[in-house]
C-alpha cells in the first residue's frame, strides 16, 4: 500500500521523478524474482546434497535382513530324535553329580568310623553281625598263633606314618625300608570264646618275610589290641589266583583263607598303635576309595555342549 501511494504522488508531481519511480519499481520486481529463484535453487541443491549423504541400500539389503531375522528351528521327527543325544548326555552328567556327592559322603563316613572309640568285638562272628561294623574299631583279647602266620603280597604301605607310597611308584619309605613288601597275617585265638580269627599285623618289607627275621618282634602270651573290621575282597583285575598249597596269597579271600588255616572268616587290621619297632607296621587300612566322578561329569557335560551346538547348527535355518 505504501509503495503504490508513493507512485501516485510521483505521477502527480510529474517530470523525471515519475520515470525514476518506474525504474525503481522495475528494479524492485527484478530483485524479488532473483530472491525467489535463488531460494528455490538453494533449496533444490540442499535436497540433492542430503540425498547424496543418505546411505543407498542395495536391492538385496531388505531381503537379506529378512532372511537373518527369520531363522527358526526346523522341528521334525529327525530333529527331535537328534535332540535326544544332548539330553541323554546331560542326564548322565547330572547323575554323576549325585554319584560324586554320595562318594564324598561315603569317604567322610569311613573316616569318622576310624576315629570312633573302640568297642568289644561281638561274640557272634557271623557275616550278618560283622558287616555293619566294617571300618569300625574293635578291641580284642587273646594270643597270636605265630606258627601259622603267612604273608599276602605284593602290598603297599597305607599307615599314617609313611611319607610315600608304593602305590604311586615310590622306591623308599620314610624309614629307608624298600616299599616292596606285603602284609603279615597271623591267626589270633580269642580269649573269651576260643575262636580263631585272622589279624593283619601290618606291613613288612620283602627281606623280613622270613619268620626268623622278625621273630623277636612277635608278641607273646595274652595281648589286648585294637583293630579295624574288614570284609573279604574280590580278586582285582590282572591279579593272579591265590595258591594256598605254595603259601602264595595275592588278595584277601576270607573263605579260602579261613578254610586253609582253620579259622573263622573274620579279618581285622591291627591299628597303627600296635606297631612294634623293627616289626610289622600297623594301620594298613586303606580308605582311599576310588573317586572318578568329577572326571565323568566333566566329560558328559562337555559332550552335552558339543552335541547341542551341532544340533543348532544343523536344524536352525
From Swiss-Prot:
* Pfam families reported in the protein's UniProt record: SURF1
Cystine residue pairs: none
Please give the start and end residues of each transmembrane region: 78-98, 293-313
Single biological process term from Gene Ontology: mitochondrial cytochrome c oxidase assembly
Give yes or no: UniProt keyword Mitochondrion: yes
Task: Supply one GO CC term from the record.
Answer: mitochondrial inner membrane
Instruction: Quote the subcellular location field of this record.
Output: Mitochondrion inner membrane
Keyword set, alphabetical order: Membrane, Mitochondrion, Mitochondrion inner membrane, Transmembrane, Transmembrane helix
Topology with regard to the membrane?
Answer: Multi-pass membrane protein
Q: What is its main location?
A: mitochondrion
NADP found in the keyword field: no
Q: What does this protein do?
A: Probably involved in the biogenesis of the COX complex.
Name the family: Belongs to the SURF1 family.
Q: Which named protein is this?
A: SURF1-like protein
Amino acid at each position: 500500500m505504501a509503495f503504490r501511494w508513493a507512485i501516485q504522488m510521483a505521477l502527480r508531481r510529474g517530470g523525471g521523478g515519475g520515470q525514476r519511480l518506474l525504474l525503481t519499481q522495475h528494479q524492485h520486481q527484478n530483485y524479488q524474482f532473483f530472491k525467489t529463484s535463488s531460494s528455490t535453487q538453494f533449496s533444490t541443491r540442499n535436497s540433492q546434497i542430503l540425498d547424496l549423504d543418505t546411505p543407498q541400500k542395495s536391492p538385496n539389503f531388505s531381503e537379506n535382513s529378512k532372511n537373518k531375522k527369520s531363522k527358526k528351528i526346523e522341528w521334525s521327527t529327525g530333529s527331535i530324535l537328534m535332540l535326544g543325544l544332548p539330553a541323554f548326555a546331560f542326564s548322565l552328567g547330572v547323575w554323576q553329580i549325585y554319584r560324586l556327592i554320595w562318594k564324598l559322603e561315603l569317604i567322610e563316613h569311613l573316616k569318622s568310623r576310624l576315629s570312633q572309640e573302640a568297642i568289644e568285638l561281638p561274640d557272634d562272628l557271623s557275616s550278618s553281625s560283622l558287616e555293619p561294623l566294617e571300618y569300625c574299631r574293635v578291641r580284642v583279647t587273646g594270643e597270636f598263633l605265630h606258627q601259622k602266620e603267612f604273608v599276602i603280597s605284593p602290598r603297599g604301605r597305607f599307615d599314617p606314618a609313611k611319607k610315600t607310597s608304593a602305590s604311586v611308584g615310590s622306591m623308599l619309605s620314610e624309614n629307608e625300608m624298600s616299599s616292596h613288601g606285603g602284609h603279615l597275617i597271623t591267626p589270633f585265638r580269642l580269649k573269651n570264646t576260643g575262636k580263631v580269627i585272622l589279624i593283619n599285623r601290618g606291613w613288612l618289607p620283602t627281606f623280613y618275610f622270613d619268620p626268623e627275621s622278625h621273630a623277636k618282634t612277635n608278641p607273646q602270651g595274652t595281648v589286648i589290641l585294637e583293630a579295624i573290621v574288614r570284609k573279604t575282597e574280590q580278586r582285582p583285575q590282572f591279579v593272579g589266583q591265590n595258591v594256598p598249597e605254595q603259601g602264595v596269597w595275592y588278595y584277601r579271600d576270607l573263605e579260602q583263607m579261613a578254610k586253609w588255616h582253620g579259622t573263622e572268616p573274620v579279618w581285622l587290621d591291627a591299628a597303627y598303635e600296635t606297631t612294634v619297632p623293627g616289626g610289622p607296621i600297623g594301620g594298613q587300612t586303606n580308605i582311599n576309595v576310588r573317586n572318578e566322578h568329577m572326571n565323568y561329569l566333566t566329560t558328559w557335560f562337555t559332550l552335552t555342549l558339543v552335541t547341542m551346538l551341532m544340533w543348532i547348527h544343523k536344524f536352525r535355518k
